[in-house]
Amino acid sequence: MMTSNSYWQRLKVAFQYVMPQIYLTQIAGWFAKQKWGKITHFVIKAFAKKYNIDMSIAQKGQFSDYASFNEFFIRPLKENARPINQNPTALCLPADGRISECGHIDDNLLLQAKGHFFSLEDLLAEDKELVETFKNGEFVTTYLSPRDYHRVHMPCDATLRKMIYVPGDLFSVNPFLAQYVPNLFARNERVICVFDTEFGTMVQILVGATITASIGTTWAGVINPPRHNEVKTWTYEGESAVKLLKGQEMGWFQLGSTVINLFQANQVRLADHLSVNEPVRMGEILAYKK
């Protein structure tokens, strides 16, 4: 017999499949960029209260300092609010949030949630070279909730080699949905960033979601919108190479979503404190060099 709780769970999942994801995200994006003065400030205050957002660490601590929701979503933090671990053999976490999953890549399969796996081929848009690069490697998936800091930083010093935009769905990526929507992260819109580092090749993926109005990077600006219907690739070589330092900002979400990191086999050892649903902060240790 189906309980009322399981009924509502199934209803939530079913709604994700039938709702107009892109249309709702476009509407949310339009509202988020409006500058309505006191109305905007009132709504921001209500949002911050609902999600218990700590404004004491923001550079701008007053709600009236933000002209739009978008400004509030990507609010920068005070200097040293997130100290970067300076151990030269360690990589640091790229974002505030919670660990959705982490661990070993079994040949080409990553764990999405208990009982659900997805493949490197699907996640990396069938880029054969990248798929081979990360077989039997390590991965970490970090979920950014609406209450979290929405900027994404570098785990280590790196040189950007390639960026790939992959069109897709806009399912919610919260841990509940990750248990029920197959192939969730590999079917959603995403931006794949490929870096050369002293820890081997590293990928950092910014995954879109429902009402994530835009994803941006510090070197290319806003990647979406507009949304595209085909995979787009940018390469960075020679004078166009982009060098980033450990802890440096590399991108942002308007509103929060998910970051996935991939590491080559036998290059890193994930930090012992990483566990599912564990709250984490940008700058804390993610992994160590093997």
Swiss-Prot record:
Cofactor(s) needed by this chain: pyruvate
GO cellular component, one term: plasma membrane
Co-factor note (free text): Binds 1 pyruvoyl group covalently per subunit.
Membrane topology classification: Peripheral membrane protein
One GO process term, biological-process aspect: phosphatidylethanolamine biosynthetic process
Catalytic reaction(s) noted: a 1,2-diacyl-sn-glycero-3-phospho-L-serine + H(+) = a 1,2-diacyl-sn-glycero-3-phosphoethanolamine + CO2
Keyword Cell membrane (UniProt): yes
Record localization: Cell membrane
InterPro entries reported for this sequence: PS_Dcarbxylase, PSD-B, PSD_type1_pro
Enzyme Commission number(s): 4.1.1.65
Post-translational modification: Is synthesized initially as an inactive proenzyme. Formation of the active enzyme involves a self-maturation process in which the active site pyruvoyl group is generated from an internal serine residue via an autocatalytic post-translational modification. Two non-identical subunits are generated from the proenzyme in this reaction, and the pyruvate is formed at the N-terminus of the alpha chain, which is derived from the carboxyl end of the proenzyme.
One annotated GO molecular function: phosphatidylserine decarboxylase activity
Pyruvic acid (Ser) sites (modified residues): S257
Alphabetical keyword list: Cell membrane, Decarboxylase, Lipid biosynthesis, Lipid metabolism, Lyase, Membrane, Phospholipid biosynthesis, Phospholipid metabolism, Pyruvate, Zymogen
Site (Cleavage (non-hydrolytic)): G256, S257
Pathway: Phospholipid metabolism; phosphatidylethanolamine biosynthesis; phosphatidylethanolamine from CDP-diacylglycerol: step 2/2
Residue numbers annotated as active site: D96 (charge relay system), H153 (charge relay system), S257 (charge relay system), S257 (schiff-base intermediate with substrate)
Protein family per UniProt: Belongs to the phosphatidylserine decarboxylase family. PSD-B subfamily. Prokaryotic type I sub-subfamily.
Entry function: Catalyzes the formation of phosphatidylethanolamine (PtdEtn) from phosphatidylserine (PtdSer).
HAMAP family membership: PS_decarb_PSD_B_type1
Assembly and interaction partners: Heterodimer of a large membrane-associated beta subunit and a small pyruvoyl-containing alpha subunit.
UniProt protein name: Phosphatidylserine decarboxylase proenzyme
Lineage, top ranks: Bacteria, Pseudomonadati, Pseudomonadota, Gammaproteobacteria, Pasteurellales
